Amino acid sequence: MRACSRLVTVAAVAVTALAAPVTASSGAPAATPPRCAEKDLTLRAEPSDDSDGVLKLSVRNDSARACLVDRVPTVTYAELDGAALPVPTVPHAGRTLAAHTTVYAAVRSLSDSEDAEDGARTVLAVHVVTVPDHDGRTFQALKLGAPAGVRVYEPVTTLWQSSAHRAETVLEEQTTGRGMFAA
């Protein structure tokens, strides 16, 4: 698997999807909010208190108006090719983030597979982007509770959720096969 080409494809699809109009429940096109300006977002990452090996992400819209972020955070690992795959697997699209609202995602960097122990790589930084054409933010492993580095093998991330608890629940359901579609 060439993860680098997959990342480029994911980013290209995400940019295209953010330009797509949002549809209201009546089926009529709704006014599409603009993409969030990077200066209007506060992006955070921290280790989960409840689940080993899980990072909690949050992004807050600090502006006074609604705007769009990608509905899946793009999470990459230092010099490694590729990005964490979304669970559930869905096409990229925009997610409206209301003014002064925060959404959450959960990221598992190391799979539970038997191959993970031998195949895992260790990185000293995790990079997160909320809108494909933004620079995003890099979080050092030490600040993420991993002084020896973050171990990575088949990483996955949830879509943005309404609460940190919901994000971790979706991650658990999706990675154990007990999940339902959760957008």
Spans of features found by a protein language model:
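Membrane engagement elements in two modes
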Residues: 1-53, 80-90, 103-110, 119-183
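Ligand/cofactor pocket segment of small-molecule handling proteins
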Residues: 50-56, 70-73
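Asparagine-centered strand-capping/turn motif at beta-strand->loop junctions
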Residues: 57-64
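Residue-level detector of beta-strand face positions
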Residues: 58, 76, 125-127
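A mature extracytoplasmic/lumenal domain signature
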Residues: 63, 71-73, 109, 132
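The feature marks short-to-medium sequence segments in extracytoplasmic or secretory-pathway proteins
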Residues: 65, 69-102
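Short consensus segments that form the blades of beta-propeller domains
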Residues: 66, 116-119
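Mature extracytoplasmic domains of secretory-pathway proteins
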Residues: 96-97, 110-114
